[in-house]
């Protein structure tokens, strides 16, 4: 939480390798060095013993909370962002990443709800061959989708949107000239921003 107000009953945790500068009310979950590259460390949230017991609302640091999170948190099982701005029927089935062909996807892990023990199987699958998966996929979203772990739960369109791509399918190939803003949404993703 960089700025803003929140109810005192909410506990915040920060999963990072560096606790310097964290607000004293934020609990630190140290990132364990397992020789994972960048975003792949996020998958460790599904590793047994990393998170305290209970239900979790995970937020990347590059999101803006702009409304109430009640509806977001009320998801009862593993839930990720559905990228409504990505026309899944038109996405390439032969996307080449670093010489390997993978399927594109329409999910995003910038916001997730899950129970601490709900996704151990995802971690265990990844840990069977982490080096190969980190080469095969550009990030964990592709891994989760292409390895068959995409959730069946998503928030409805308009609750979470992309500042760069907006909310509508046609925005994927023609992003708005100006950064997109949807006042009624709960969360804005700052994905695809580059220097914005």
Cite the ranges covered by each PLM segment:
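Short, solvent-exposed loop/turn segments at secondary-structure junctions
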Residues: 18-21, 33-36, 63-65, 84-87, ...
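N-terminal anchoring/stem segment of glycosyltransferases
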Residues: 1-38, 50-53, 192-196
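Catalytic core and acceptor-binding pocket of nucleotide-sugar-dependent glycosyltransferases
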Residues: 106-196
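Short, hydrophobic beta-strand segments that form beta-sheet elements in well-ordered domains
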Residues: 8-17, 55-60, 78-80, 151-156, ...
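Short, well-ordered coil/turn elements that cap or connect secondary structure elements
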Residues: 7, 23-25, 73-75, 149, ...
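GT-A fold catalytic core of metal-dependent nucleotide-sugar glycosyltransferases
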Residues: 20, 28-30, 41-90, 114
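A short secondary-structure junction signal
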Residues: 68-70, 90-94, 122-127
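A short, conserved beta-to-alpha structural element at the edge of catalytic cores
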Residues: 79-103, 108, 115-117
């Amino acid at each position: 939480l960089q700025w803003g107000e929140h109810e005192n009953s909410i506990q915040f945790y920060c999963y990072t390798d560096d606790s310097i500068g964290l607000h004293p009310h934020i609990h630190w979950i140290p990132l364990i060095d397992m020789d994972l590259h960048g975003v792949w460390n996020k998958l460790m949230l599904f590793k047994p013993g990393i998170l305290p017991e209970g239900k979790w609302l995970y937020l990347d640091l590059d999101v803006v909370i702009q409304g109430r999170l009640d509806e977001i948190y009320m998801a009862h099982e593993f839930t990720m962002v559905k990228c409504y701005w990505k026309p899944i029927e038109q996405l390439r089935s032969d996307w080449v990443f670093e010489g390997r062909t993978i399927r594109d996807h329409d999910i995003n892990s910038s916001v997730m709800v899950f129970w601490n023990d709900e996704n151990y199987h995802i971690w265990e699958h990844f840990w069977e061959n982490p080096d190969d998966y980190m080469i095969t996929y550009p990030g964990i979203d592709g891994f989760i989708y292409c390895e068959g772990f995409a959730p069946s739960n998503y928030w409805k369109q308009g609750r979470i949107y992309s500042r760069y791509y907006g909310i509508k399918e046609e925005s994927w190939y023609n992003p708005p000239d100006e950064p997109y803003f949807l006042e009624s949404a709960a969360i804005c993703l700052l994905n695809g921003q580059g220097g914005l």
